[in-house]
């Protein structure tokens, strides 16, 4: 190879390396973090709808069976709650037949194998409309019930139809716990975004540290609606061996405190908090006082003052030194509302672009 050819080759290599360097500067990494059942995966699905043309036909087939599974899980939760509240099944032959059919189906098939045929759908519909289940639903905000339970069971006829294909709202409502690490990449304005969704279950959280390098923005999702709910903490037990109970919102606060003050996130990493599930919170706050979670709360049990109080409590968890370098940005969200998430995410990206400007050097 002549010297001229070698020079041309080196020039091409250098230009390619420079292009890759520029491209890497334009890639922004966004981390989605939060505890179990906070709505994190729903935000992730919204990004696919808003920025990636939604879902494939195969995705919709998989979501169809996931929705069937969610319906069975919801009915299990309602029947367990009826036992807990001591609400006996209606004394009716049709309800007894429906309950027996449902239980025998559960013996034959696992939740993941469900085919929502007409007979099973009829049994589910009869149970859902029975008086003892209505009594449970009157206290649904006290239960650990799938957020989508009423949504799907209300529409059991549509969902059990042979030609059923999930709508986008069905997909957003479908619940599956995130396990492992899932990534998507999509263009946004003058940059490319890599969004990383990390499993929120307690057993998954030890994996989070592996995703903390070169993060431009953290979206931490906390379900504000969990303020009156408690989960069993299998890792911490009482003297008698029974698990301790942890308030869901308090647990999110502890998690957020660790993340927001973590040394891996420099002053150039935007920290953004989504107080999510405000639709459920609005339903609850007039019935279940905020003092369930915050004993020192002195305000009225109304949406706006309660939201402001929770926002302030989260803000106080971030150290003064960090807040001096970069403020905490908080948004009140409903993850199943596409317009709300589109608007909020646009605002978040303005913040991330601004804070990342010095780091990525392309604005």
From Swiss-Prot:
Binding site for GTP: 34-41, 172-178, 197-201, 276-279, 335
Top-level taxon of the source organism: Eukaryota
Region of interest (G3 motif), ranges: 193-202
Keywords: GTP-binding, Magnesium, Metal-binding, Nucleotide-binding, Transducer
Disruption phenotype: Slow to respond to octanol.
Annotated ranges, domain G-alpha: 26-363
Annotated spans, G1 motif: 29-42
Gene Ontology terms: cellular component: cytoplasm; heterotrimeric G-protein complex
Region (G4 motif): 272-279
Name the record gives this protein: Guanine nucleotide-binding protein alpha-11 subunit
MF (Gene Ontology): G protein-coupled receptor binding; G-protein beta/gamma-subunit complex binding; GTP binding; GTPase activity; metal ion binding
Family affiliation: Belongs to the G-alpha family.
InterPro entries reported in the protein's UniProt record: Gprotein_alpha_su, GproteinA_insert, P-loop_NTPase
Pfam families in UniProt: G-alpha (PF00503)
Function of the protein: Guanine nucleotide-binding proteins (G proteins) are involved as modulators or transducers in various transmembrane signaling systems. Mediates the transduction of food and serotonin signals, which modulates the avoidance response to the odorant octanol. Has a role in lifespan to promote longevity.
Positions bound to Mg(2+): 41, 178
Subunit field text: G proteins are composed of 3 units; alpha, beta and gamma. The alpha chain contains the guanine nucleotide binding site.
Region annotation (G2 motif) ranges: 170-178
Tissue specificity: Expressed in ADL and ASH neurons.
Residue numbers spanned by region G5 motif: 333-338
Species name: Caenorhabditis elegans
GO terms classed as biological process: adenylate cyclase-modulating G protein-coupled receptor signaling pathway; determination of adult lifespan; G protein-coupled receptor signaling pathway; serotonin receptor signaling pathway
């Amino acid at each position: 190879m002549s010297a001229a050819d070698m020079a041309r080759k080196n020039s091409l290599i250098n230009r390619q390396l420079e292009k890759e360097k520029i491209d890497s500067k334009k890639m922004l990494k966004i981390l989605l973090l939060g505890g179990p059942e906070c709505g994190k995966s729903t935000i992730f699905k919204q990004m696919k709808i808003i920025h990636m043309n939604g879902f494939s036909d195969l995705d919709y087939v998989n979501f169809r069976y996931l929705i069937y599974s969610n319906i069975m899980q919801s009915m299990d939760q309602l029947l367990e709650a009826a036992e807990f509240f001591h609400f006996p099944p209606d004394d009716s032959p049709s309800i007894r037949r429906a309950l027996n059919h449902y239980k025998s189906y559960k013996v034959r098939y696992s939740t993941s194998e469900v085919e929502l045929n007409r007979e099973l759908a009829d049994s589910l519909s009869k149970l859902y409309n029975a008086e003892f289940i209505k009594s449970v639903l009157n206290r649904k905000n006290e239960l650990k019930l799938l957020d989508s339970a009423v949504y799907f069971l209300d529409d059991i006829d549509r969902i059990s139809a042979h030609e059923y294909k999930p709508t986008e709202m069905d997909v957003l409502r479908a619940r599956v716990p995130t396990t492992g690490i899932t990534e998507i990449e999509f263009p946004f304005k003058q940059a490319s975004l890599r969004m990383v969704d990390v499993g929120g279950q307690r057993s998954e959280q030890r994996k989070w540290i592996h995703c903390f390098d070169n993060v431009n923005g953290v979206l931490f999702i906390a379900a504000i609606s969990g303020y009156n709910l408690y989960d069993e903490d299998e890792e911490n037990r009482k003297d008698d061996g029974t698990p301790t109970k942890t308030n869901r919102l308090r647990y999110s606060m502890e998690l957020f405190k660790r993340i927001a003050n973590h040394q891996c996130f420099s002053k150039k990493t935007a920290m953004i908090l989504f107080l999510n599930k405000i639709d459920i919170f609005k339903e609850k706050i007039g019935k279940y006082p905020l003092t369930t979670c915050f004993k020192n709360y002195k305000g009225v049990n109304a949406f706006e003052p309660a939201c402001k109080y929770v926002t302030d409590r989260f803000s106080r968890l971030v150290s003064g030194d960090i807040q001096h370098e970069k403020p905490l940005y908080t948004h009140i969200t409903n993850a199943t509302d596409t317009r709300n998430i589109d608007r909020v995410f646009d605002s978040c990206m303005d913040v991330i672009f601004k804070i990342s400007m010095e780091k990525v050097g392309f604005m």
